[in-house]
Amino acid sequence: MLEPPAAVVAYLDAQRRGSPPDRACTKAAVKAVLAELERRAPGRSVELRVPPYAAIQLIAGTAHRRGTPPALVQLAAPDLIDLAVGSLLWADGLADGRVRASGERSDLSGYLPLFDPAVQFPS
């Protein structure tokens, strides 16, 4: 597993210190997570939405071009980052409604977590 990118570490560090990460920090962390997901699961069959920050298409299969995608995953930024570092499991996110997924290939559990959860923070 990879070490988390600096943007994800900054986001987690802000949370650890008890201050909510600002919008720019959150956006940078979301973009870093999505970039790694795109790298690991290239394709256009699933749309992953993290409003209001970004949406990407990933996983090989039937390409989505217009309208409602055949497979859709939507979640909030904190939940995406928690999935990426392993502090939220895919099944738990689905069960409690933090992750909304529908359609063929929308199960992203095989790609998560992305990063080593043992993040080392500066003192």
Regions flagged by a language model, labelled:
Residues 1-123:
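Feature captures hydrophobic
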